[in-house]
Amino acid sequence: MPQTYAGQKRIRKFYGKIREVLEMPNLIEVQKSSYDLFLKSGDQLEPMDGEGIKGVFQSVFPIKDFNETAILEFVKYELETPKFDVEECQQRDLTYAAPLKVTLRLIVFDIDEDTGAKSVKDIKEQDVFMGDMPLMTPNGTFVVNGTERVIVSQMHRSPGVFFDHDKGKTHSSGKLLFACRIIPYRGSWLDFEFDAKDIVFSRIDRRRKLPVTTLLYALGLDQEGIMDAYYDTVTFKMVKNKGWSTKFFPERVRGTRPTTDLVDAKTGEVIAEAGKKVTPRAVKKWIDEGSIENLLVPFDGIVGRFAAKDIINEETGAIYVEAGDELTWELDKAGEVSGGTLKELIDAGITEIPVLDIDNVNVGPYMRNTLAVDKNLNRESALMDIYRVMRPGEPPTVEAASNLFDQLFFDSERYDLSAVGRVKMNMRLDLDAEDTMRTLRKEDIISCIKALVELRDGRGDIDDIDHLGNRRVRSVGELMENQYRVGLLRMERAIKERMSSVEIDTVMPQDLINAKPAAAAVREFFGSSQLSQFMDQTNPLSEVTHKRRLSALGPGGLTRERAGFEVRDVHPTHYGRMCPIETPEGPNIGLINSLATYARVNKYGFIETPYRRVNDAVVSDDVVYMSATEEMRHTVAQANANLDDDGKFVNDMVNTRMSGEYTLNPREAIDLIDVSPKQLVSVAASLIPFLENDDANRALMGSNMQRQAVPLLQADAPFVGTGIESVVAKDSGAAIMAKRGGVIDQVDAQRIVIRATEDLELGDAGVDIYRLRKFQRSNQNTCINQRPLVKVGDKIGKGEVIADGPSTDIGELALGKNVIVAFMPWNGYNYEDSILISERISRDDVFTSIHIEEFEVAARDTKLGPEEITRDIPNVGEEALRNLDEAGIVYIGAEVEPGDILVGKITPKGESPMTPEEKLLRAIFGEKASDVRDTSLRVKPGDYGTIVEVRVFNRHGVEKDERALQIEREEVERLARDRDDELVILERNIYARLRGMIMGKTAVKGPKGVKPNTVIDEDLLDGQLSRGQWWQLALEDEKDAAHIEALNQQFDTQKRALDHRFEDKVEKVRRGDDLPPGVMKMVKVFIAVKRKLQPGDKMAGRHGNKGVISKVVPMEDMPFLADGTPVDFVLNPLGVPSRMNVGQILETHMGWAARGMGLQIDEALDEYRRSGDMTPVRDALKIAYGDDVYDDAFADRDEESLLEAAGNVTKGVPIATPVFDGAKEADVNDALIRAGFSTSGQSKLFDGRTGEQFAREVTVGVKYLLKLHHLVDDKIHARSTGPYSLVTQQPLGGKAQFGGQRFGEMEVWALEAYGAAYTLQEMLTVKSDDVAGRTKVYESIVKGEDNFEAGVPESFNVLVKEVRGLGLNMELLDAEDDEGGIAAE
């Protein structure tokens, strides 16, 4: 049981039966470890070469100039401390980053003009500032320009070699055309493919195809070399007057019908007749006997075969046949041999002919045919061909062509397979190259083509590109590394040019480097990359899920339009690696996934999942992590397989997975078993109780909607949970955990001070101050607020929860509320998933949430003079200024409504020409108040609430107003309070240690009044001396004296460090702010609004059951139970059967039982308060939790702690039912019986309006419901007049633009159908884009008249202009002007 401090306060009854061997890894580990590896900030050890940011520098440096007279080398790098901490960055809209210093070495050479020998002339080293490097916050996010962002990990195709075919789509015959592709991490793609005629082609970067032999020629092979690489050679020896003798391969004729008799060359005996099938038995006999070595083939049996080597006349050097040529012979009419290459060979007396071993059954002639098609015959012409394809239009030279070809695949700067790519290639092609070999080799290309030809011959399998062994994850660190490399390469070009143009002897490295490109690349990545996303901060779960997301989109990935079904589909290898449930609905389905709970990413970027080892059908606790490729070789049992107490499989045959198939296997064959049933789903899905009883589509919606739950005013952990709630609350960073054990020294709403007692290091003050976040705005405008859970004097262990955050309750995730629901229709108000709620929900603020909006206003310096933030605004009455202070900024705590002024601001207007009277007055009175207009920040329509925070930012050197000074004073006071508290605890600790050191020792001398050689005791220390005088006691023992001196010095050092830190922070507060150019002053105002639940708000359960509130019914009208309790929600029972999410019904029953047991405990506590007897409380706890849990968690507790634990569960006893291993139907029935209910889970309900009982019993229970972030207040919107579109002059659309309602085509038809001509005319003219008409209407409304006329809509004028743009002049004629009667005709 969880015996942490928070865990003791509320005990969950756990229904899981499977023992958890492995703790769930930290949920945001993916992000943190990846970026740590990139920056190597986790450990200050010397980073390994070739990895992270150091690897990037090493891949770009050293940089040489064009003449190689100077060289710029990379020595080391270091990250300095960031200027502002995370919180300061968020407040000031800055990026949380650390300055990157790089040490570079410039070596200048002297070159001897005669010999060309180099000698070092000068070496200079210097630290160069390379811009700021964004740092990750402890929660795995980045703060960029003041907002929290998350870099989503990307799934992409792993580098390596892939074999595939076109599934028969290319050719009409449906023939499979095989292809092979070598994908590097960066560099050119190389493809090999068959065409319909079985010729092998190659393509570079998907350009025009060339015969593959051209590529092989370019690699330096000749015809003979190519034939040698791809075919075995068979030798035919001439047997006088009989034919040819050749080696016999019995295996090859198994199951075939030979076209000619097979004749043993030695005996001349026919061993198999033509046309008869060769049986396997005969083949086995031939192999076992081994007597038949050679076959006799008739003279024409060799015709049509291909020569394996050039056959040359030794004397003259003339070539009879080249390698790959067909052996032919021609017959005359009489059937006599008259010519052909074969006749030439026989005539020349050649008796042995080496032939390619092509039999068109096991080995096809594809490479030989390709050779025949290829026009190139040597390396030069092949290189020229490749050059023409890659650089069309440029005249090729052999040198240029050779350089280009080398750069394409063999130059480590242009081509990188990456370690992953090399490992994958080695595995696929059975090679053994080192994984440091990052470019291609000749052998790699030859092997790829060989494997492709084997596929065509019917040996081997194609790869499945959706297999997770062929897809890998690029996390933050790697994405950042690639981006930084791009920046450095841009910089490299500039450096090279500068090295050539400056006087190299006099410059320092600093002068050569312009770090802007590198810094810009980083900024661009964090600001505008598709994978850098605004963090979803609605609640802690949405944060965690966002950080664990895997996207197949983004640069170098797929696009929504191009992705087919296969990529999006669930693949067997997703098991335990990617969640099969959680993915968005809509166009991104299957492209954006979530990491499974136990999964982790290995160093190669493949996702691994843990398994327990199984030896001889016994499960051990030894855990191994496996990637999808490694897992294919194993037989894996499921976590819920039946085991006995010793961990042995009970059943002889067990359900297992093996290489992607689900089969029954004997228990001895099993070598792995899942660690936990929840390892196959993601965090969000594992929060759904009874997930195993829900349909997958609804579970998907449930997972997605939990992420949209708004944090409520009062969090309430679910009665029916899954046991993983506390993990999410901790790992998300929403709840605060103690960094080390200690005792609570002070607690208030703003901070917690802990006096540490564990992990104390020498020179450590032993004080931990935790600042709580109070009513801060999240990215989604929800409210982040933390509340302490501890009291002064509590003892706390490391990692225990000391404060709750948004949507957490005693250290557990609490996204919604437990409410009493009834499944029944109620006057049609729950038609189509509508929800009926009781007025109690609104009255007691059950589903009330706080939302915080941020408004900002900037006073700029304009051409006409500076804008001013002031209370003195022209033409504004005192009533409108009631909430402003003397500086013109709204008070904290003011209640504001639409149109209220938040910050008063005036802007100078352009001078208007003056009248003579004005000139006179001006001459008399001097400078008149120049014209200003009111540009104050006002509350937008539809917004209202309370001001919770105001921040004022001033430019350096601009005088601060009263409000800014007040805010500054408060901030400095807060910092001083922190410093003082830390100092008090530091002094207490130090003096306690000092006291321990000197107590009972002899003092040689001391302050006034202490006699020499006094023994130090309590009276002396506490009575006579002040604490400060203790240091003046000189001890007899020199060793002790030295210890005390060291302690004193340590005390001074720590005090100085404290003061220095305080002064540094105060200086930051007092210093002006960096504001955008032209801005003198900026004010931010935060408005908080409480939103109650109201009709139109969207609610949901955890099982994908969602609906909109239709009506709030008075409590007395709601259906009520026999004891008079009215239900809170009425849901439609028809929403369950067709949706097949039965989990919600089980949850309802289980929740009902939990509530019933809670009420029993409540009654027992009442009894205790009356009688003082603990027995009924203990009995009630025993009934609720069962004897086992009671003995484990409650039996040994003292009275006070037991009462607290019991008091926390009076509303309902919380239970945990883990996914796929939770409570079964029998458990639910048992719980209902213990709570004193019937096992049907149904209750008698009475109609609140009539008081009569309903016709039959109704399912009533407690369900956990969430209020989603789709609030009617944010959506509803009305407009009278507002902004218009420039061209069409029609009102804009949407709430954000304060737009109008669209009156579309269909609506026009509706009015036409009703014959409402005038209404229609009004809609199309004055209410839309008849500019003159709408102005007149406005005027007449103001005057109180009701006559107007419609004119010509502006869109008609736009149409006329369009037509004129096509060269047709179109004019409108008035009826009066129409003299010729054109209109009448």
Curated annotation (Swiss-Prot):
Domain of life of the organism encoding this protein: Bacteria
UniProt record, GO biological process: DNA-templated transcription
EC number(s) reported in the record: 2.7.7.6
Molecular function in Gene Ontology: DNA binding; DNA-directed RNA polymerase activity; ribonucleoside binding
Major enzyme class: transferase
GO CC terms: DNA-directed RNA polymerase complex
Keywords: DNA-directed RNA polymerase, Nucleotidyltransferase, Transcription, Transferase
Pfam families linked: RNA_pol_Rpb2_1, RNA_pol_Rpb2_2, RNA_pol_Rpb2_3, RNA_pol_Rpb2_45, RNA_pol_Rpb2_6, RNA_pol_Rpb2_7
Reactions the enzyme catalyzes: RNA(n) + a ribonucleoside 5'-triphosphate = RNA(n+1) + diphosphate
Subunit structure: The RNAP catalytic core consists of 2 alpha, 1 beta, 1 beta' and 1 omega subunit. When a sigma factor is associated with the core the holoenzyme is formed, which can initiate transcription.
Role this protein plays: DNA-dependent RNA polymerase catalyzes the transcription of DNA into RNA using the four ribonucleoside triphosphates as substrates.
Protein family (similarity comment): Belongs to the RNA polymerase beta chain family.
Record protein name field: DNA-directed RNA polymerase subunit beta
Gene name of the encoded protein: rpoB
